[in-house]
Amino acid sequence: MNPFYNHSMHNWTKSLSKVEKINLGRYGLSPVITLRGVIIDWDFLRAYIRLWDPEVHVFRFGAMMEEMCPLFEEFCPIIGCDLNAPLVKHEVKIGYIRSFETLFQFSRPQARAMIVDDQKAILLPLIDEFSEACPNDPDRMRLRMRALVFCLLAGFLFNQDPGFGDLRLCPMVRQMEDMGCIGGIVLAETIRSLDRAALGFDDWTVSVTSLPGPPVNPNEPSRDATNCSIVIEKDPLLRFG
């Protein structure tokens, strides 16, 4: 994990004003800030992966093999999104660089300076650009909120490449700005990652509804508070339909 990125996000979220925290509710991510300090319990993590049945996507436990599965209605409040809102969908399209420019009102040179391989944005310069609040400039504050949401999505909910943000997240930020619900995508990717972990694949990651976590090696426990409790597949965006 990039310690500079982690530190920058920590400072940014600490600096949010009361109004900005309230405005995060529009995107359905308010609890993400609240859960920043959660420390992963590795024993619990390993235990619930052993209880997961990847065939039917449920936890099985007890002598009677009771079943429990993550429910959309229970999952959305954890993230903070409205389960009755229209679902955020992944838009398969070309021109994601243009989406990045438009989302943050960057010039082409500005955007290009932050983009790697035409596919992902380096998050540190994006944080540097928007981490300073400008309360007297509403347009700038709106772009700052978009940047924060983009970084939270890239570094927490879809953290397959810590320190970078997939450009395919840009259309999702716009849908969330219109109060779309991200819970369906996050739940689907959580289940897929649980499946991969239970089947023994090593390319699954953990993250805490907040800051990014590195790829997990179950044989090397860590108490890093920037890791966390929701399991996400390493490259979730590849499977959106």
Functional labels for PLM-detected ranges:
Residues 1-201:
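N-terminal leader regions that mediate targeting or early regulatory function
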Residues 2-5, 9, 205, 222, ...:
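Compositionally biased, low-complexity segments enriched in small residues
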Residues 115-132, 136, 140, 211-241:
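Extended, charge-rich alpha-helical regions
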Residues 202-204, 214:
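Extended alpha-helical, oligomerization-prone segments that build pores/tubes and scaffolds
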